[in-house]
């Protein structure tokens, strides 16, 4: 998955799903222009609405997301997460398919860095609603907008990621696949590392 920004090798934020951004003079409002070539692994375009939906879902108290607090910088986010305001009052709106406006509670100099954190990643609303409570529980119940897609997930054993052929920056992705193993015994982990 990929957010509006990612961190480069020097840990500096660089545009990812966003093509560019502007910040208001008071530092409390950001406008992001999204890449028109950013796609989900199912071929759907990644839109500003995907970010709004994901952030509203993150903050919905019924979701009980452990990392919801990381979005409290966004206007009304904390009140929404506490059930004091509806998710529709979140300070994030899709101006059009490729323009996202975000209002903050106060200036946050490291806000672009935060956007690289997974809690700020988008979700394909249509796909999430289609999968319902099964969303994200298996490799085939998730769509991806980043450099890799999960092609196999054997619970308690491991998972496999394959290069996402729909990824906007696929030319720079050098690996074709990544295999992860779940290893519970510390001694086994050490032996595998050597």
Language-model segment annotations:
Residues 1-25, 143-144:
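N-terminal lobe/hinge region of extracytoplasmic solute-binding protein
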Residues 19-67, 101, 189, 194:
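Aromatic- and charge-enriched surface segment that lines or borders ligand/interaction sites
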Residues 23, 33-34, 94, 104, ...:
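Hydrophobic residues in beta-strands and at strand termini
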Residues 25, 94-96, 155:
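Residue-level recognition of beta-strand termini and adjacent short loop/turns
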Residues 33, 52, 66-126:
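Surface-exposed binding/hinge segments that line
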Residues 104-177, 187:
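Gly/Pro-rich hinge or "lid" segments in bacterial periplasmic/extracellular proteins
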Residues 179-191:
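Short helix-initiation/N-cap motifs at beta->coil->alpha
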